[in-house]
Amino acid sequence: MLPVPSTDFEHMFELAPVSLWLEDYSAVRRLFEQWRAAGVVDVVPHLRRHPECVRAYGASIRLLRVNRRTLELFAAPDQATLEASLDQVFRGDMFESAIAEIAQLWDGVPEYANQTVNYALDGRRLDVRIRGRILPGYEGCWSRVLVSLEDVTERVQARLRLERSEKYARGLFEHSPVSLWVEDFSAV
């Protein structure tokens, strides 16, 4: 098998059809060590009692690099703009999903998966499926974590529309002031 030139890997990262983030979680690892030294055993209830710890987790992640698809998805002209606007990207309805992500890492799992909400810089809500992986060789320090984001907004919105439609039809059927019944004439 021929060795793959490093430029090929650069192109694969940059041109991947999914959003890719290369991040440094070494400060997260140190934060976890502090929490453990303070006596935290079960991280989920601890985080619910201390939401500032979730914010500390987020602030501990250092962004190293993103690819083009990330910039397109988040409507950012460049990485510096995206990085300066992360408080707009990660906000509000992320609390519970962040706890799930933290719990997976806390348990020593080198990979995590999660579904959450982010926001593009133009204000659009993005439902995203996140997968993170501590890269091989960095398990001891967590200084290289590859995170992918899949935009599942259309799927989530379609499911919500279907649920609303079903609820409307069920309500119409159950609360109609006249008799309604359904017949199947497909066999006729």
Listing of model-derived features with the role each one plays in the protein:
Residues 21, 64, 96, 101, 112, 114-126, 129-133, ...:
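PAS-family sensory domains
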Residues 121-125, 129-145:
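Short loop/turn elements at sensory-signaling interfaces that couple input to output
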Residues 70-81:
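PAS/PAS-like sensory domain cap-loop motif
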